[in-house]
Amino acid sequence: MAEPAGFDVDIVPVDVQMQRNQHYDVFMLEHDYVGAFAIGFSLNDPWIQDFKVSHTPAVLFDNYIIGNPSTAYVGIDNDEGMELAVSYLARLGHRKIAYLSSSLGSQILQIRHAAFLRAMHQHGLNTTSSSTGCSYYLSECMEKHLPRFLEKGMTAIICSQDTLANAALIQCQQLGYKVPEDISIIGFDDIPIAAYTSPPLTTVRQDRLELGKSGFFALSSLLNSISISTFLLHAQLIERKSTGEVPVT
């Protein structure tokens, strides 16, 4: 949408060293960029601080900046998405639902974690420290948290990302558990691989094309001095084969 509208679009990889060497506004000015769609920043990245005071329009996909009219956030309604996942599992009879996440270093992962706790509370389902697990490394999630969930008799696991859900699915199978007969697994994002895991992954979809369009609309608004704060899309639960009714004991 941006190119047909007359914009030149560059895809620019950004690492931490680059952010330390040059502030966001300076980088944008030197390269004659009028705005940016920023993806994949962690809360500790230097430019996150820049986005709080920047005058150059920026639309962030996975972080929300408070108080700067030059920035906007686009994404799905994660509260809605987590509610869809929890209510779906509850209808299948699951009461012992765990939540597995990679490091809470990005705001979107913090939002999803909090959304899980709220959704569980709304359905009258208990959560404890033993029913949630967060680690930076995928391997640590599999070695530290997943076995604990299984030992505690969890019958379903919601994962913060599809890649994590796929790893959990494979690990459960290697430990002798059948998915979904013994344990149900739900992912988040609906990346292309989700439809081709074994079994195919039930997940919460965020439509990448619609997110791209939303990012363009938000950035266009900022460039025209329309101060958009958030632009949320509805979440959608994609039911596949990694979830089933609670196992009979």
Where are these regions (language model features)?
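Alpha-helical recognition/docking segments in bacterial nutrient-uptake
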Residues: 1-87, 147, 152
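Short beta-strand elements in bilobed, periplasmic/extracellular small-molecule ligand-binding domains
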Residues: 2-14, 117-139
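Short acidic/polar active-site loop segments enriched in Thr and Asp
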Residues: 34, 95-97, 155
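Alpha-helix capping/helix-boundary segments
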Residues: 43-44, 104-105, 112, 163-165
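Hydrophobic alpha-helical segments within soluble ligand-binding/sensing domains
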Residues: 74-99, 114, 118, 138-147, ...
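An alpha-beta-alpha
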Residues: 83-123, 230-243
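Short acidic capping loops at alpha-helix termini that bridge into adjacent secondary structure
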Residues: 95-96, 127-130, 179-184
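Flexible loop/turn connectors
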Residues: 143-249
